[in-house]
Each structure stands twice: as structure tokens, then as C-alpha cells.
């Protein structure tokens, strides 16, 4: 799989779609600082936001429908910092234009939307990565690989509770309409599932139930025979917030380490995209995996609401 630039020696030209907090705090800094990448431009729905972010990182701003096409023309790949159901059709558009894609999780909040992305990527033969933080942060990526190799796991527990909507929270991410509508299941659920599935195997049976506020509880049966429980939410009191992932099995217990922030992890995702472009070997956390995550989350949401 060759990049649109025609050579793997040249920097990979990656354009950024989106100008919100995630783009400002994580993606744009990571792309601009990456030695193997040229940040080829920033597109935003608001011209002033696109101009500000592009100026901060020494690149060009794009806006409007024609700006999307112009950014695709100037890029080998595009990264997305947009709500999932805005991201999905634009990812299809980028793939059909022959551009590699680096998506945020979840790929979409409907199965049809996620399937359209995976199908477009397959038909175009482009590289794809879905940015699930723990799969690309160096510390947790190495830990996941180690636990997969150890095997013999009996059960697991994952708890990802944020305080985004807790009283007194001042997080700018709380202003995201899609997060408020879909809650922790959709925002942090992909992170937990992206750790459990490679270690324990695919989910063969899923049970979901609602908890307080936006919290969702899952019980999963995996193809290895192991089971896992998951608690997800964005409304925990600040003193109760935190992330814990633990496996228990034949060799004892293993708990996930901490990691050095989202920007470092995103650089790892950029590296993974570049490697897939270079080798043509799909990454395990690609558009197909993103589609499967959406299928599981839709099933869980349906059960929890019922």
C-alpha cells in the first residue's frame, strides 16, 4: 500500500479535520511535532477557528465544502477530530478519494455508518486506524501485548469512570453535544473494549444494564471462555473517578499501568498509520475493528435502554 505522495521516504502529509478541544489539545500538536509527518492543513466549520489552529502550527486553514476537497487534494491522509456521525461520512469521502484515514473512536454511532466506513476503506485499499488511546500509548500497548501472550485468563474487570458531568466540573469536553447525548458507554466504552477483546477474544455474549446518571454496566462472555465486567460513565463524583483494568487467571492478576497522556498515544497511532501505509498490513485497530465496536455498543445501548 503506497502513500499518495508516491514514496515512503517523504513525510506523510496528514490533514486535520476539526478544530475543537481534542484537535487543539492533542491532534494538532502531535501531528505538527511528528518528525515523519507534514501537517498539510486544518479544516474547520468556522473559518476563525481553522485560521487560529492552522496559524498556531504553521500550516494552512481550510473551510467550507470546497475546503474539504482542497485539503484532501493536499494530503496523503486525514485525521479526524469531529463528532462520530460527522466523521463517518467524511471518512467515506476521504477513503474514496484515496486518502488514508486516522479516525477517532467511535467511528460512528450507527451500524450503517460504521459499516460504510469499513466498506469504503476496503474498496479503496487505503490504510485506516481507529484511535483507541490504550492501544497506542506505549505503556499500555506493551502491557496488552504481554497479557495476550500470557493467556490463561479466567475473568477481567474494567472500570472507566470520568467526572466530566460531575458538579463543579469545568472540562471543556463537557460542551460536546454527542458526549452528553450518548454518555460514557460511547465515549469511553471503546477504550475498555479495545483492551479486553485482544486479550480475552471477541465478545460472544453481552448483557447491559443502566446505572446512575449516564453509567452503563456490561457483562461480557468472550471467545476464550473468559468473562469480563465493565463499568462506564462520565458523571461520577470527582473523588470516585478513575480507570482500572485488571485480569485474573492461571498466572495470577495483572493490572493496567498508567500512561503518559493522549498526545503521546496519538503519536503512536500516527506511527501505526505510517507503518500500515508502508507495509500494506492492516492494523488490528482499523476501520473493521471500529465497525465491530459500534456493533457492540449499539447492542449494549439497546439492552440498557430496554
What do the predicted segments below correspond to?
Residues 59, 97-99, 124-127, 225-226:
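A short helix->loop->beta-strand "cap" motif at the edges of active sites that frequently abuts
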Residues 38-41, 76-78, 128, 183:
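Short active-site oxyanion
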Residues 1-58:
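N-terminal Rossmann-like dinucleotide-binding module
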Residues 57-118:
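Beta-loop-alpha module in the N-terminal Rossmann-like domain of NAD(P)-dependent dehydrogenases
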Residues 1-11, 66-69, 77-79, 223, ...:
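C-terminal helix-rich "cap/oligomerization" subdomain common to oxidoreductases
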Residues 127, 134-206:
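Predominantly a Rossmann-like dinucleotide-binding segment in NAD(P)-dependent oxidoreductases
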Residues 22, 45, 238-241, 260-271, ...:
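Active-site loop of classical SDR/Rossmann-like NAD(P)-dependent oxidoreductases
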Residues 190-257, 271-279:
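Contiguous beta-strand/loop segments that form the cofactor/metal-binding neighborhood of enzyme cores
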